[in-house]
Design a protein with these regions (language model features):
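A short, conserved alpha-helix within the catalytic core of class I
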Residues: 121-130
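Conserved class I S-adenosyl-L-methionine
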Residues: 1-53
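Conserved Class I S-adenosyl-L-methionine
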Residues: 124, 179-263
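Class I SAM-dependent methyltransferase SAM/SAH-binding core
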Residues: 56-101
Length: 263
């Protein structure tokens, strides 16, 4: 179980509880997202990449074709179990560990990635370690993708239903924001690039239901089995009011931090 006073009012959560749904329904990043990363010059052939809080290995698996050497890490044993199963036939090394407890040699990676997870880290511990692990002029990519509930009736109604069962869930109400460097990074890293864009992602009733169930407010929460089943019944009833196929607007951001030279 994880716990952070700034997330969900300090309630415990565990992504390992949601791993099966996470593996099935959260591999939804569009090709445009991966292409943006490659266009910036990262996660390509000849590079060593460390993916922090890799979950079920979504980023390494989808970017493996670009030729980089990947290591994926996650604190959840169950997440890593699914990552390994989904990565069969791919030469990706997975490690069970929190980001803060990892230990690698200096100058070991060209790129470090953190996708949809940066808010969970202890930044005062992680940034000095990341700086040490990266090669000179190495890059730390912090990425995020969120649905926009104020621009989608269905997304808003889904959020309301999550909050009905888990009022402490703080992952709601996302809006566009300016991409800026975290304060803790500024002594070690400079901003090399910022990227942000909107995209409409396609869903069916089933895949949107699965995506919401796999969020921190339901599948990874401490709700009991009966509560989750009741939520599922209500959410499926809500979805029956909408077409079988639809799109949900999302906002994507990439923050590219470059190691500051000591020279």
């Amino acid at each position: 179980m994880l716990k952070n006073e700034h997330i969900d009012c300090g309630k415990e959560f565990d992504w390992g509880l949601a791993s099966a749904d996470y593996a099935k329904y959260r591999d939804i990043y569009p090709n445009e997202f991966y292409n943006k990363i490659v266009d910036l010059g990262y996660c390509k052939g000849g590079q060593r990449v460390l993916d922090l809080a890799t979950g079920t290995g979504v980023l390494p698996r989808n970017m493996y074709k670009y030729g980089a050497e990947w290591i994926g890490t996650d604190i959840s044993e169950n997440q890593i179990k699914f990552a390994r199963e989904l990565s069969r036939g791919l030469d990706i090394n997975y490690i069970i560990s929190s980001a803060e407890n990892l230990d690698f040699p200096e100058n070991n990676f060209d790129v470090i990635t953190a996708c949809q997870c940066f808010m969970y880290f202890n930044q005062s511990v992680l940034f000095p370690k990341a700086y040490k692990w990266l090669k000179p002029n190495g890059h730390f990519l912090i990425m995020f993708m969120a649905w926009l509930p104020f621009e989608s009736e269905l997304a808003m109604e889904s959020e309301k239903l999550v909050l009905k069962y888990n009022p402490s869930w703080s992952g709601r109400g996302m809006t566009r924001y300016e991409v800026t460097a975290p304060e803790m990074s500024k002594s070690l890293f400079d901003v090399a690039n910022t990227v942000s864009f909107d995209i409409d992602l396609p869903f069916t009733r089933e895949t949107w239901h699965g995506r919401i169930k796999a969020c921190r407010g339901i599948g990874a929460s401490n709700l009991n089995t009966e509560e989750i089943l009741n939520w599922e019944k209500e959410h499926k009833k809500l979805l029956s009011l909408y077409p079988e196929h639809f799109t949900i607007p999302h906002y994507v951001t990439i923050l590219d931090l470059k190691c500051r030279s000591n020279g």
